[in-house]
A protein has these predicted regions:
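N-terminal alpha/beta PP-like core and its mobile active-site loop of ThDP/TPP-dependent enzymes
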Residues: 2-362, 403, 483-485, 517
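A structural motif corresponding to the C-terminal end of an alpha-helix
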Residues: 161-163, 303, 396-405, 522-529
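Phosphate/pyrophosphate-binding active-site segments
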Residues: 5, 10-31, 169, 192, ...
């Protein structure tokens, strides 16, 4: 796997108290099966190998149970938001279900933005949330979230950021509640189990093997409904692939369908890795605000658009509405898109796309897309100030990354540049969270991805994202994870600086920072962490080579400018409007 986690338990086992109310066997594990044991053992049986969380009094029994399971590791994060994004990244890897655990009170409340991202992006995540004992519901207990007698109602709260939320009050109910929650998560989004401490500690006449672990089977529509329309298309077809293609591991099936249709292929921004090769002549780039202009022109030259595994939200649809209005639109996926279309439902794109391809066998497999030409790029204005340019840095990074590297990108200017200009590794993943678009997501998600896939993971983030959740680098150091953090330090929330400049006449800035030396600071904080600042383009190739060659984590902090405009269509459209109509007042 390229990293090691110390699972030695001998000394800790010897130190465990034999005076636990439940009693302990000679190996230290409590006699009988607690609800906490059943949960952990069940997760292990269905293939979960890591759970992510932050400890606390009302979740510690779950960690205790994990200690005694040799097939599952409980990972300690620094913050519950990042623990949730670790589970999200783990799930996006395709390895298995992402699981996050948090204690009651402020700890569980920190899960909300992470689960919100998973809900909006339809990522399967199971959240195990500790609560005070049921006997104290509504009686003023510390961190009471029972909803009784004026207490915060955790069930109502988490129901808003999940597909399924259930509070367990009877220990035996875990036998039905746990598989129900797992099934809900596997349908595409978070599920939450609220677990009072006394329930977790209760001994039940039940083991994990007594609970059914059958795979969730979800109904799908007959793809024949759209096969006829595709077969009878009078012009060429443009496919826009979404994040469900990656989640369902349907890349090969997508390419076979594309070949059968001789279609052009684009992806939404958070599905760059849905295509086998972004350099294929049939690939026309990324859609939306950080996408490629050629997608809209390809749509207008064809007669039909096929959406696969995407709802095409505004971020992915920007600039396409006019083109979409001129063509027929079909859709396959787990949820209907936000645009008018004929939609067929599928929770398993591998199966559905294979069926669709079989129904569309072409007699002439010759492709009309024979010439290799990269997608047309957006052209931001040239920046002549100090700092390394985004485009230049991405070109060097593109040359340096291993063929199997996974890439996780954060929100912001550096993220827009990476989505627009950095190619997907042939054997790697490319992850960006645009459901909620919260800054700091990449640090936890990169850790989850590294645990899941055990290969070099590259996190690309700005200094603003780092100051929010970058201390999860400590988690990468603690577990020796193979993650290279590439930080673009422009001493600002630079995308917000650009908005101040373009939409508010550059009268002020709330979003510029005093200079910081992130690379040097992390090197001082973690003496064993290779970490450096890079101030010139010439120094970047060697810095990346060294950072990517170490066994564990590393950091490269690149000095860039907050005044450089990223490849982000709304900014470029605003600049173009001002240049063509210089007397028109800026509008937000």
């Amino acid at each position: 796997m390229g990293f090691a986690v110390d699972n030695s338990r001998d000394s800790e086992t010897e130190n465990r108290s034999a005076a636990c109310d439940l009693g302990h066997n000679r190996l230290g594990r409590p006699t009988g099966s607690r609800v906490a044991d059943v949960i952990i053992d069940y997760l292990s049986l269905i293939g979960v190998r890591h759970i992510f969380g932050v400890g606390g009094a009302n979740i510690e029994d779950l960690y205790d149970a994990a200690f005694f399971n040799d097939d599952l590791t409980a990972v300690l994060a620094k913050h519950e938001f990042s623990a949730a994004t670790m589970a999200d990244g783990y799930s996006r890897s395709g390895i298995g279900l992402g699981v996050v655990a948090a204690t009651s009170g402020g700890g569980c409340l920190n899960l909300v933005p992470g689960l919100g991202e998973s809900l909006a992006s339809r990522v399967p995540v199971l959240a195990l949330v500790g609560q005070p004992p049921c006997t104290m519901d509504g009686r003023g207990s510390f961190q009471d979230t029972s909803g009784r007698n004026g207490a915060l109602d955790a069930e109502a709260l988490f129901s808003a950021v999940s597909l399924h939320c259930e509070r367990i009050l009877e220990p035996a109910d875990i036998a039905t509640a746990l598989p129900r929650a797992v099934a809900a998560a596997r349908s595409g989004g978070p599920a939450v189990l609220l677990l009072p401490k006394d329930v977790q500690q209760s001994v039940v006449d039940l083991t994990a093997r007594d609970i059914p672990t059958a795979d969730t089977v979800l109904a799908a529509d007959d793809p024949g409904e759209i096969a006829a329309e595709l077969r009878n298309a009078t012009g060429h077809v443009t496919i826009i692939a979404g994040e469900q293609v990656s989640r369902d591991d349907a890349r090969e099936e997508l390419e076979r369908l594309r070949a059968a249709l001789d279609a052009r292929l684009a992806t939404v921004p958070d599905a760059k890795d849905a295509v086998a090769s972004s350099r294929s002549s049939a690939v026309i780039g990324v859609t939306g605000v950080m996408g490629h202009p050629g997608v809209a022109s390809a749509l207008t030259k064809g007669s039909l658009c096929l959406l696969i595994g995407t709802r095409l939200p505004a971020t992915a649809r920007s600039g396409l509405d006019a083109a979409l209005s001129l063509v027929s639109t079909l859709s396959v996926g787990s949820a209907p898109p936000f645009v008018p279309c004929t939609h067929i439902h599928s929770h398993d794109l591998r199966a559905t796309l294979a069926e669709l391809t079989t129904a569309l066998e072409r007699q002439d497999p010759t492709s009309r897309w024979s010439s290799d030409s990269p997608p047309e790029e957006l052209q931001p204005p040239k920046h002549r100030g100090p700092g390394v340019r985004y485009r230049d840095a991405m070109a060097i990074l593109d040359d340096a990354l291993p063929v199997d590297a996974d890439v996780v990108v954060d929100a912001g200017n550096s993220g827009a540049a990476a989505v627009h200009q950095l190619s997907v590794r042939p054997a790697g993943r490319f992850v960006i969270a645009l459901g909620m678009g919260g800054m700091g997501y990449s640090f936890g998600a990169g850790i989850g991805l590294a645990f899941a896939r055990g290969r070099r993971t590259v996190v690309i983030a700005g200094d603003g994202a780092f100051f929010m959740h970058g201390m999860e680098i400590h988690t990468a150091v603690e577990y020796g994870l193979p993650i290279t953090f590439v930080l673009f330090n422009n001493n600002a929330h630079a995308m917000c600086v650009t908005r101040e400049q373009l939409f508010y006449d550059d009268r002020y800035s709330y979003n510029r920072f005093r200079p910081s030396r992130i690379g040097a600071g992390l090197a001082a904080m973690f003496p064993d962490l290779p970490s450096r600042d890079v101030e010139s383009l010439d120094a970047l190739p060697e810095a990346l080579r060294q950072a990517l060659s170490v066994d564990g984590p590393s950091v490269v902090s690149i000095e860039c400018s907050a005044d450089e405009i990223p490849p982000f269509a709304p900014f470029l459209d605003n600049i173009a409007t001002k240049e063509s109509q210089p007397d028109v007042a800026a509008s937000a």
